[in-house]
Amino acid sequence: MRRKNTKTNYLLEKIASLLANEKRGKLLDLGCGDGDYSFRLKEPGFDVIAADLDEKRFKYRNEINFKVCDIAKPLPFPDEAFDYVIAAELIEHLKNPYAAIGEINRILKRSGQFILSTPNVLSLKSRLRYLFEGCLEYFREPPLEQSKNPKEVIFNLHLIPWRYPELEYLLVNSGFVIEGIFTSVYEGWGWGFVLPLILFQAWQKARRSLKKGGLDYRRINKILLSKELLFGRHLIVKVRKWGGVAGG
């Protein structure tokens, strides 16, 4: 039975749109939570398996295959078992993200796709919050105090604020090719008055580096100064496993 949700989940709909034109196949919703993402992606015909540590939160036991899974340990799936893996708002919670991303690569088929999202800590809104509060957007609660709350709250503990450059490094060094960078919804246009200063600083940094024979920042600056990174609520990255070509 379909469960109606009158409030639009922009992140969910964006992830669904990134898969809309892909060939249907076996999809793992890792860290599925209540299962809304799994249910949404099952509708257009994906063969969905949902996986999470807490089965009690999952709402679709009669409709979707659920697997109890501790993401901190090796995943309970064979090599190259899935065509697609999604991990929405998961990586910021992980204590050992390198091991987890390596496991995702292992269970993906050649040229399989992985879509992940995480709070966008490089947005203008987040940068200004850090300036005034000393904390980034979605990382306002002190982890030590929050960790003393009941166990169900610990599942929502944000540990690592992922900037795009570090996330890109993690993915590429785990055997993935970046295919696209997206966001869920744009916000914070009112903070655009600081944009000229940010653009000038980025230009100066790139210029000084090249002048001294250092790094070439032009590629990464194009990403960091994109509207997705400056005004997006979430950072969504779509990657493909090495070993195949798109559509292969």
Predicted regions and their residues:
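Conserved SAM-binding loop
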Residues: 14-20, 25-130, 236-241
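Acidic, Ala/Val/Gly-enriched low-complexity intrinsically disordered segments
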Residues: 245-246
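S-adenosyl-L-methionine-dependent methyltransferase catalytic module, highlighting the catalytic core
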Residues: 2-6, 10, 36, 40, ...
